[in-house]
């Protein structure tokens, strides 16, 4: 945290920075961002995430050299008045492996061991908080430690960091927490135990909301219908991605929810011609070459969203895959986010030939980054909640006793009015603590205040419930 109380963060395995851009939107200062692929890190530069050019670190995080560059940036920010890194965000590659009866190969385990690097960097940096985002099975997936032990990732995180942090892991579908598309993922949040009596990871999770439909997000005239190969004149990122024209017949007559594999005419089913004979493609997944439905939730955005043959990519009525702009809306990426080193106005002013050249050079990278990203709104909400917690007034036990005496809170009616008015702008845990201390019968009735840390620990070990009501025996 800087002297002006503004917050700082570090982002690891940051790709194009789509997710952690949410922290940028909330006014956080990016100390360092690490990504091994330069073309993705370049996108972060275009968006001005880091104030210092040296904050963009391209390199393998497993090497001492890359780690040293990150630590050097922390030192630079200490000289600028930063007392401590506030948040470390990490989205390490993780190969999902079933915990039962599943063969694990060396490359899978090595990829999962990048989680080890993230955890060890958190331990070295000692931020106030950390946020890991990953696949649904993240915590149950195996990784290999530096001493060659194979352990579950969730257990490893708690073994290494549990002494210093309150840790919660939660599996949620992002479409119910701020994203516009389905994406079931794990969030693991750790909060320094110094804050155990004021806020916990559960206070930082994004808020629940009903999912939106495809029509809500890109329908009802939000986007112009596109002709073959058209790039919208006033929005470079809304464009018709072309493909082999012979494939158009496969999807042209489909209604919402129908697949090209359902066409009665074999010439309209996905196929190739070998020695003059039609050889139909194998139908591996129902959702390939399938028109999406307007009035259902938006399916997960995948990395191969450029292909008709990929999952859930075909527009409900137009003969094309979703445009980059439509995908940005699905992933809650701000309209002004830059994918190339030109402003939207500059892109729109270019000739068609110039626009197509930029698409040719950048479209695959953009679409892959979209498919791998954390929706911006998810991280923005977490960033906003962290900031809100740090902005709240904190009081010591001595201060609480002074407040009780100042307002005469031993009187029940006075206490009720104090809680309703909250003239000292206290946080909820502090109000609860005051109520407990002023309850003369707390020992007789065992009416003790249970702090948030204990509640968080109980919640963290509970299983996920699928029913609205459960019986507890």
Q: Where does each model-flagged region fall?
A:
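Class I S-adenosyl-L-methionine
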Residues: 1-3, 14-17, 72-84, 94-288, 360, 367, 373-388, 394, ...
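Core alpha/beta nucleotide-donor-binding catalytic domains of modification enzymes
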Residues: 2-125, 136-140, 144-150
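A detector of helix-start/N-cap boundary segments at the beginnings of structured domains
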Residues: 9, 317, 442-446
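Conserved proline-anchored active-site loop of SAM-dependent methyltransferases
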Residues: 11-20, 82-101, 129-135, 188-192, ...
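Short, solvent-exposed loop/turn segments at secondary-structure junctions
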Residues: 17, 38, 93-96, 136-137, ...
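C-terminal target-recognition/interaction regions appended to catalytic cores
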Residues: 241-395
């Amino acid at each position: 945290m800087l002297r002006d109380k503004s917050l700082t963060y570090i982002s690891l395995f940051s790709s194009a920075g789509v997710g952690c851009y949410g922290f940028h939107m909330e006014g956080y200062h990016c100390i360092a961002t690490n990504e091994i692929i330069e073309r993705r890190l370049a996108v972060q530069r275009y968006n001005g995430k880091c104030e210092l050019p040296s904050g963009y670190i391209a390199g393998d995080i497993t090497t001492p050299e890359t780690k040293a560059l990150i630590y050097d940036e922390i030192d630079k920010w200490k000289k600028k008045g930063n007392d401590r890194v506030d948040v470390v965000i990490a989205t390490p590659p993780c190969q999902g492996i079933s915990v039962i009866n599943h063969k694990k190969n060396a490359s899978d385990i090595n990829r999962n061991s990048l989680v080890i690097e993230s955890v060890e960097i958190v331990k070295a940096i000692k931020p106030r908080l950390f946020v890991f985002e990953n696949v649904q099975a993240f915590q149950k997936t195996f990784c290999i430690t530096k001493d060659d032990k194979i352990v579950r990732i969730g257990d490893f995180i708690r073994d290494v960091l549990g002494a210093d942090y309150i840790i919660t892991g939660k599996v949620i579908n992002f479409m119910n927490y701020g994203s516009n598309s389905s994406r079931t993922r794990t969030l693991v949040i750790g909060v320094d135990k110094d804050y155990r009596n004021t806020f916990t990871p559960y206070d930082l999770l994004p808020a629940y909301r009903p999912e939106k439909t495809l029509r809500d997000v890109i329908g009802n005239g939000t986007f112009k219908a596109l002709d073959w190969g058209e790039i919208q004149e006033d929005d470079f990122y809304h464009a018709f991605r072309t493909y082999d024209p012979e494939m158009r017949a496969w999807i042209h007559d489909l209604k919402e929810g129908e697949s090209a594999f359902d066409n009665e005419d074999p010439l309209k089913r996905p196929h190739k011609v070998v020695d003059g004979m039609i050889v139909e493609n194998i139908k591996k997944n129902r959702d390939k070459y399938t028109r999406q439905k307007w009035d259902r939730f938006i399916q997960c955005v995948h990395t191969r969203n450029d292909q008709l043959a990929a999952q859930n990519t075909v527009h409900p009525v137009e003969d094309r895959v979703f445009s980059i702009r439509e995908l940005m809306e699905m992933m809650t990426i701000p309209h002004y986010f830059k994918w190339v080193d030109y402003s939207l106005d500059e892109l729109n002013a270019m000739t068609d030939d110039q626009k197509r050249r930029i698409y040719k050079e950048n479209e695959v990278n953009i679409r892959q980054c979209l498919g791998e990203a954390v929706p911006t709104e998810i991280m923005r909400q977490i960033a906003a909640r962290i900031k809100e917690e740090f902005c709240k007034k904190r009081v010591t036990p001595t201060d609480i006793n002074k407040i009780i005496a100042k307002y005469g809170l031993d009187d029940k009616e006075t206490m009720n009015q104090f809680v309703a008015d909250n003239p000292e702008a206290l946080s909820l845990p502090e109000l609860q603590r005051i109520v407990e201390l002023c309850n003369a019968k707390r020992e007789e009735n065992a009416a003790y205040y249970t702090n948030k840390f204990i509640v968080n620990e109980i919640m963290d070990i509970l299983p996920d419930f699928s029913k609205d009501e459960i019986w507890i025996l």
